[in-house]
Amino acid sequence: MKNLLCLPIFLFALSTHAQSQKSKPAETSYFPPPGEWQHRSPSSLGLDSTRIAESIQFALTNESKMPRDQQLAQAETFGREPYDEPIGPLAARGAPTGIIIYKGYIVAEWGEPLRSDMTNSVTKSFLSVVVGLAVDQGLIRKVTDTVNQYLPPIELYNPLHTESPQLIYPFETPHNKVLTWDVMLRQTSDWEGTLWGKPDWGDRPGNKPEEWVGRPRNAPGTVWKYNDVRVNALALATTCVWRKPLPQVLKTYIMDPIGAGSTWRWNGYRNAWIVLDGQPVQSVSGGGHWGGGMFINAYDMGRFGLLTLHRGNWNGRQLISEQWVKQSLTPTTANPGYGYMNWFLNTDHKLLPSAPLNAFVHIGNGTNFIYVDPAHDLVAVVRWIENAAMDGMVKRILAAIP
């Protein structure tokens, strides 16, 4: 009788253990080496080939209706803004593209996966990882520190300017002085100011112009607002902390170790240059708003997705701390569907009703997205699909998994 009483407890523990194992990918997952990536047929890994084919057709059928010319696409998206003029590079995009990665292997691909296209706000996920690297290496002590304490006066680089050097203090106002790295990462800072010719209120302004300028600021952490001026202020602050261009940091600590190719570029604006240790350095942008941001191919996006699937670990090497990934996946109080930029969460099933609660997505305009699903050891890169079709795409991919 005593043994029988213990049996339900044992079964419950076994069930709990099994569920926890489903929340993270298998230890034997394949990691692609530089310059190559093994392909497997869906059926060889137990997937339904017909369902996979249906998901690809769905992606093609639901191609984004925005123009492929990104100059026109930006105008249609942001043309109502008072400071909508592009100041960074914009490029025409390619065809609808994607790859499906299961247990590390590519089981399907379509479009032009080698083409380096703008990825828009997926760039923000790369930016937050670079901030995380600074925390991991002790350059930033903790994310609850104020940003201002880490910044010197910043000299703008303008070789045509013959007068005294121009200095900027982006975190010196009474409101900005108390902003922490955490609220900047979560887009709950309500940072105020103008950077690279773009005022904070000029990004996605409301319908009442009289409220654009001079309004009372929201207390940090209380209101979530997607705002690229503030993202770019974070990128500038992070550049100062690293004392080097952020693309070099990303290349050294993330992209080279995961075997990314040589065609990705992280661009800034033509006027976003500072003097850093006597050298001109471009402060990159956190997305494609006004141009710039990350230009990258689908394969390299997939490698980054695999890195985040494995909580910062690449084939046994911890590139970004698991603690940082955990923080990135912690819901923001003012917007529980958002962690650190640009880790969109599914904890309430609102983003992707068809996906598991612990799935997350790196999303950029276009729509470009990297779907990461630890419960199924799955990553999907989908580019240039209608935003409303995201869940339908994920639903069809998941239908192929037994």
Where are these regions (language model features)?
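Short, gly/Ser/Thr-rich active-site loops of penicillin-recognizing serine hydrolases
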Residues: M390-P402
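Active-site-adjacent helix/loop patches that line small-molecule binding or acyl-intermediate pockets
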Residues: N62-K65, Q149-T263, A298-G302, L307
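Structural helix-adjacent loops and short alpha-helical linkers that scaffold large soluble proteins
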Residues: D48, G138-V143, G193-W196, T239-K251, ...
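Active-site Gly/Thr loop motif
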Residues: S262, W273-G288, L329-V379
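N-terminal leader/targeting segments and the immediately adjacent pre-domain N-terminus
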Residues: A18-P113, Q137-I140, A400-P402
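Bacterial Sec-dependent N-terminal signal peptides
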Residues: M1-S23
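Active-site-proximal binding-pocket segments
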Residues: L250-K251, M255-L329
